[in-house]
Amino acid sequence: MVEAFCATWKLTNSQNFDEYMKALGVGFATRQVGNVTKPTVIISQEGDKVVIRTLSTFKNTEISFQLGEEFDETTADDRNCKSVVSLDGDKLVHIQKWDGKETNFVREIKDGKMVMTLTFGDVVAVRHYEKA
């Protein structure tokens, strides 16, 4: 099922992302850059691993993981997290935990586009991607 996500995706639209980053404790300067950056996300499957590469003018990140298995992740804003990504039906659910906190991203395909819903506490942001 992860195959549905395997593509190159370009961010087209973002709602409430600044509030989400603020809730995470991301500094003002980094938030300003994050708000104007339109990253390209490349999701692929390499053997039994899923690889998510995020490319932007601000920072490039790459994570490689097996579905359902915890892994160490350093985020674009330099948080060191314990993360797990799993499939929940047709959704790709990514949970990050650090310093007693937790955030999650839910990626789903709607009308050929990828919609990513980011939740931290009661703050929700939505980012829309189209195939590049």
UniProtKB/Swiss-Prot annotation:
InterPro entries (UniProt xref): Calycin, Fatty_acid-bd, ILBP, Lipocln_cytosolic_FA-bd_dom
Molecular function terms from GO: fatty acid binding; lipid binding
Location of the protein in the cell: Cytoplasm
UniProt key word tRNA processing: no
One Pfam match: Lipocalin
Positions contributing to a fatty acid binding: 127-129
Similarity field: Belongs to the calycin superfamily. Fatty-acid binding protein (FABP) family.
Function statement: B-FABP could be involved in the transport of a so far unknown hydrophobic ligand with potential morphogenic activity during CNS development. It is required for the establishment of the radial glial fiber system in developing brain, a system that is necessary for the migration of immature neurons to establish cortical layers.
Entry remark concerning the domains of this protein: Forms a beta-barrel structure that accommodates the hydrophobic ligand in its interior.
Protein name, per record: Fatty acid-binding protein, brain
Species of the source: Homo sapiens (Human)
Protein encoded by which gene: FABP7
